[in-house]
Amino acid sequence: YINYKNMSHQHMLTLFNLLPVGSNISIWWNFGSMLLACLMIQTITGFFLAIHYTANIDLAFSSIVHISRDVPCGWIMQNTXAIGASMFFICIYIHIARGIYYGSYLNKEVWLSGTTLLITLMATAFFGYVLPWGQMSFWAATVITNLLTAIPYLGTTLTTWLWGGFAINDPTLTRFFALHFILPFIIISLSSAHILLLHNEGSNNPLGTNSDID
């Protein structure tokens, strides 16, 4: 008689116990996994918010109010997407700080892919912040996009192209919404590359202990 239930349980234990990670890592190594959880939450809530959002300067703010008041569980989705973005940045800054402290930047491919991820994430957050088209988000869109004019020769042309005209208007909001929607999928692709590069090289050994002691 063979107890297949116990065998499958043992295989599951073996699967988790043979992960290529030594016991010399600490709680600071959790934040990569937490970032993936944040990315999943943001993508799901963002999708449902995009269904009800209207990318029009006259209707954007009203559509946010509509999501919060009229859509079933809309206020949860809206708050989760907003607060989740803050959690995303808290996790990524701790993740980076751990990398700097323990010398993870020596793994150049992983570090450069992570830097690209951070820049893409900051751009995504900016485009998302602008979407309600309230007083603060309109001001932020004006001030931050105007920074492009500081680029020699190309600055004014780039700003006009991003605005979709000579001032911030309806085409600007439409472009920002399109960019905010597509960038998370680019982040997912970059995250996959980041993880593959890490697993190709392996994590560092901060305490210099024998990784086979387990």
UniProtKB/Swiss-Prot annotation:
Could you tell me which Pfam families the record lists for this protein?
A: Cytochrome_B
Provide the Gene Ontology terms for cellular component.
mitochondrial inner membrane
Q: Which InterPro entries match?
A: Cyt_b/b6_N, Cytb/b6-like_sf, Cytochrome_b_N_euk/bac, Di-haem_cyt_TM
Output the GO biological process annotations, alphabetical, semicolon-separated: mitochondrial electron transport, ubiquinol to cytochrome c
Q: Does the keyword Cell division apply?
A: no
Write out the residues that bind heme b b566.
Answer: 95, 194
Membrane topology term reads:
Multi-pass membrane protein
> For this UniProt entry, what is the primary localization, expressed as one broad class?
mitochondrion
Q: Which PROSITE patterns match?
A: CYTB_NTER
Q: Which UniProt keywords apply?
A: Electron transport, Heme, Iron, Membrane, Metal-binding, Mitochondrion, Mitochondrion inner membrane, Respiratory chain, Transmembrane, Transmembrane helix, Transport, Ubiquinone
The record's subcellular locations are:
Mitochondrion inner membrane
Cofactor note from UniProt? Binds 2 heme b groups non-covalently.
Give me the segments passing through the membrane: 31-51, 75-96, 111-131, 176-196
Residues annotated as binding a ubiquinone are: 199
Extra information? Heme 1 (or BL or b562) is low-potential and absorbs at about 562 nm, and heme 2 (or BH or b566) is high-potential and absorbs at about 566 nm.
Family, per the entry? Answer: Belongs to the cytochrome b family.
The annotated subunit structure for this chain is:
The cytochrome bc1 complex contains 3 respiratory subunits (MT-CYB, CYC1 and UQCRFS1), 2 core proteins (UQCRC1 and UQCRC2) and probably 6 low-molecular weight proteins.
Report the function annotation for this chain. Component of the ubiquinol-cytochrome c reductase complex (complex III or cytochrome b-c1 complex) that is part of the mitochondrial respiratory chain. The b-c1 complex mediates electron transfer from ubiquinol to cytochrome c. Contributes to the generation of a proton gradient across the mitochondrial membrane that is then used for ATP synthesis.
Q: What is this protein called?
A: Cytochrome b
**Native source organism of the sequence:** Bothriechis schlegelii (Eyelash palm pitviper)
